[in-house]
Amino acid sequence: MMGFLNLYKPKGVTSHDVVDEVRRKLNIRRVGHAGTLDPFAEGVLVVGVGSTTRLLEYLQVERKRYYVKALLGVITETFDITGEIVEERECNIPDERIIDVVKSFVGKYKQVPPAYSAKKYKGERLYKLAREGKIISLPPVDVEIYGIDKIIVKKPHFSFEVEVSKGTYIRSLCMDIGYKLGCGATAKELKRLSVGTFDIRDAINPFEVGREKLLESLIDVQKVLPLPKVEIYKDFVENIYNGNQPTLDFVKEMVDSFSKDDDVMLICNGQLVAIAKAERNSKFLEKNLPRGRIFKLKKVFKEI
């Protein structure tokens, strides 16, 4: 059993709860997710099933889109409404100023990750350390805000949709907006609308569907992974399973072109056999000897 699932995580549950629900309904232990969503947040959560968990790192998820509603004049420990209130301030700022400040964050900027987050410090999750009273201040990281639109101001709230780079914390963005306004702000509602090509309009709630719906919703890894494909002969599949490095005589067809050092998918009869690193440019493979090694195996999959 292999494939990705485009799931909808409802409010009030953890990303791990979603994984557990999939494990229970599909009766499979090997399930993992890409990109944690906080319990108070909802929206798209990409899940890998079976050996697909080993492919989550190859997903093209550099861009994510969110809807967020923030509360003005409130600062919390966690940068969201679930945290303890640290400070409250009056906020009599004109709507136009709020809109201008929100828009000013489009582009690259250095962002400090929240102390309460799934980010790791010396192997430990920050939120676990914070709950133990160990507040870790991490250095700012470079993030990019690709665009902000649909800004609505209804004091004491304001909301907008935002497209961001991987690793951007929307809670931190709300805090930074509040800081620039001079009155503070905290995230009140958060919905992830998309992760790469995974869109909320296609997402399914694993708590509301059964096993059959989950199975029919599995997405073939080849439709999602942005890697070039190479078709290999069936006679050589067992060689790969035994750890033999692919040579030119393994290759049936170069489905896509690739460069040296690119990761490629080795497929046979429509099934993924392995992920391998190209040791030659596809343009020059014909110059190789039939038994000359052209790929180095990285991950092998035996579901074929």
Curated annotation (Swiss-Prot):
Q: tRNA processing among the record's keywords?
A: yes
Q: Which GO terms describe its molecular function?
A: RNA binding; tRNA pseudouridine(55) synthase activity
Question: Which EC number(s) does the record attach to this protein?
Answer: 5.4.99.25
Catalytic site positions: 38
Which keywords does this Swiss-Prot/TrEMBL entry list? Isomerase, tRNA processing
Q: Which domain of life is it from?
A: Bacteria
Q: List each copy of the PUA domain by range.
A: 227-302
Please give the catalytic activity noted in the UniProt record: uridine(55) in tRNA = pseudouridine(55) in tRNA
The residues forming the signal peptide are none
Q: Name the Gene Ontology biological process terms.
A: mRNA pseudouridine synthesis; tRNA pseudouridine synthesis
Q: Which InterPro entries match?
A: PsdUridine_synth_cat_dom_sf (IPR020103), PsdUridine_synth_N (IPR002501), PUA-like_sf (IPR015947), PUA_sf (IPR036974), tRNA_psdUridine_synth_TruB (IPR014780), TruB_C (IPR032819)
> What is the role of this chain?
Responsible for synthesis of pseudouridine from uracil-55 in the psi GC loop of transfer RNAs.
Q: Which family does it belong to?
A: Belongs to the pseudouridine synthase TruB family. Type 1 subfamily.
> Protein name, please?
tRNA pseudouridine synthase B
Q: Which organism is it from?
A: Thermosipho melanesiensis (strain DSM 12029 / CIP 104789 / BI429)
